Design a protein with these regions (language model features):
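Cytosolic covalent-transfer regions centered on His/Cys nucleophiles
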Residues: 1-161
Length: 161
């Protein structure tokens, strides 16, 4: 059993979802999402965490096919594994380096520094869901923070812990 028990802690909540997100670039999008994590007490140091997210982003693009960006970092500033979600405003998109174009769904994944295997499992499990067009479209069309949080959390119910 890993430190993450999905029955006890939801990875995302409606408060961690931004609808109609508008950002100048991927760094600003990550900053908006990280601010939600900070406000909810899920990260302890906003600037320190963002430095790590941006450093990770410079190492390798985090764009997935189908218009998804998944900036992520393992960090000592993370209190609990969390996912903040941004759905861009209609007609707005951001470059996360995906070969097929810009992102309209951004999922910021934050895991504690010591949780290496958990970080990889969350990334892999979420990526499997995000590769399905119907899942991506459900997130984009929801227009409701509660529904989006539930979709993300339910996609990770079978997370092997």
């Amino acid at each position: 059993m890993s430190s993450l028990d999905l029955q006890d802690a939801e990875l995302t909540t409606p408060e961690l979802v931004i609808l109609d997100m508008v950002a100048e670039n991927k760094e600003e999008a990550a900053a908006q999402l990280a601010a939600r994590l900070f406000e909810s007490g899920r990260i302890s140091n906003l600037e320190g965490f963002l430095e790590q997210v941006n450093s990770r982003e410079h190492q390798m693009a985090t764009g997935l096919p189908g218009g998804v960006g998944i900036p992520h970092a393992r960090s000592e500033h993370v209190q609990q594994t969390s996912i903040a979600v941004g759905v861009t405003r209609y007609g707005h998109s951001l470059d996360f380096g995906a070969v097929d174009g810009r992102a309209t769904l951004i999922l910021l994944i934050a895991t504690p520094a010591q949780s290496f295997s958990e970080h990889l499992e969350v990334l892999a499990t979420l990526a499997r869901s995000l590769f399905k067009e119907n899942f991506r479209e459900s997130l984009r069309r929801a227009h409701d923070e509660e529904v989006i949080a539930e979709l993300i959390n339910s996609s990770l119910v079978f997370f092997d812990h």
